[in-house]
Amino acid sequence: MAFTSSPSYGSLNAAFWRTIFVVHCISTLVFTTISTPPEDPVKCVSGNTNCTVTNSYGAFPDRSTCRAANVAYPTTEAELISVVAAATKAGRKMRVTTRYSHSITKLACTDGTDGLLISTKFLNHTVRTDATAMTLTVESGVTLRQLIAEAAKVGLALPYAPYWWGLTVGGMMGTGAHGSSLWGKGSAVHDYVTEIRIVSPGSVNDGFAKVRVLRETTTPKEFNAAKVSLGVLGVISQVTLKLQPMFKRSLRYVMRNDSDFGDQAVTFGMKHEFADFIWLPSQGKVVYRMDDRVAVNTSGNGLLDFMPFRSQLSAALAIIRSSEETQERFRDANGKCAGATLITSTLFATSYGLTNNGMIFTGYPVIGSQNRMMSSGSCLDSLHDGLITACPWDSRIKSEFFHQTTFSIPLTQVKSFINDIKSLVKIESKSLCVLELYDGILMRYVTSSPAYLGKETEALDFDLTYYRAKDPLSPRLYEDFIEEIEQIALFKYNALPHWGKNRNLAFDGVIKKYKNVPAFLKVKESYDPMGLFSSEWTDQILGIKGNVTIIKDGCALEGLCVCSEDAHCAPTKGYFCRPGKVYKEARVCTRADDISVIQSLSY
């Protein structure tokens, strides 16, 4: 069944999206360096007391408000030790926060209202650089952008990293953040770490705080626990990374139809070191990233300034968000698909923000140094302009507001999973335009890691971004299709969710998927026997106490539960809990009109 738009609105779709996107692109190009950076995620009523913490999107998956009695901003390791010691002596709960707080999940939250937040905002210095050993030691609040720049100063490069440079070193390690590669040690930043300094609660004899220096050669078990720690072992103070000599990359994007994508996805990562994909399933297309290492003396001064990470006019963002809300209200599938086609084709035509010389794009391949090609995020490093412009998801304005469902499928099962998604598209070709409005499904390669809470095998990471309503009880257009994909991944293929993204249901029983959990929990018990750095959320996802799912009316609409009865959806708005269309074990919130159509198609 195809949902049709209302005549008065739908007839304007193409012209509307062309107009809006022209404004959007102009603002992106013109205002790249004139933006308002994000505010501190911690806000306090008086000084550093009576505080709340949120993420950069302004809402956690359950929309709860996370409170703390105080926030501390240590500027040195000595100050950090003093903060941890005082809190340990008082038996206070603690959690670490970062400069921008990009984790969607509640990893920054402490329990109750009496806890302490420890911000690494000012632990942002380079400690030492050893060009001969090719190592760089930084404090945990250093951003990826700083890390890349510091390494480049001495002719070194981090080989793989996330594409967004606003993450901190500590944050990347806390959640297992990664780029895309099957080569070398893989794409996870933590697998290029050689030493970790971490401050944990201590005994009376320790002065209530203990500093440990962890290395793979001397403390392998503790080291592998700390590499992806969810922040439950203490506060990482410093990290030493093993780098590589600077190199260049040669990159081109190629768009193809997705007829053979299941086979290509399995093998493409071994052909290109930095390969990834942007899949547009409703359009039947895939954008292949052909991205390879070349010699540092190869001609080229290319730059990646990814367009969706640039500053944008707040007024344009508000119009785009309002249009999406209108499309949801009128169930305007045609409008979403028209917008998705325009956005994705324009991004491809503008090479996603690649330029050959930092100014203009003249053609492929784009060749540039690793520090100029691996990550971006220019909306962060700019002057305050009173929110005339901002990062596209800035919660202080009417901006993007979305869910992110991100998981890793074992490479051996990727073809089958892709075919399952294609089967859903065959049932309703417009169903996944809702993903393409947010640039499609980003797919990145990951490898197995010795980190206890790292990836278990070679896999493809699927990143789905899609509309989230401001009203938690508002159902979404085609939400049953997205929910079914989510459940196919998590339950049929046993996918591993990204620790820093996802909705609650992705973490239901997740810890059973990791074979080294007992070893991790043993280190956790040794480092923090009182659980001062743990929270209700970390206890739930680690399987220690409680459950991540929240059962209440409407809980399935925001992924707080998998529906088991109609009340978990929105029955008064015509959405009922029903089996999946391809994966019959799934339970999804389906609109009544769609149920009758699907049933008729099955006969």
Swiss-Prot record:
It comes from the Eukaryota. It is an enzyme of class 1 (oxidoreductase). PROSITE patterns: FAD_PCMH (PS51387). It catalyses: L-gulono-1,4-lactone + O2 = L-ascorbate + H2O2 + H(+). The keyword DNA repair does not apply. Its EC number is 1.1.3.8. This is Probable L-gulonolactone oxidase 6. The gene is GULLO6.
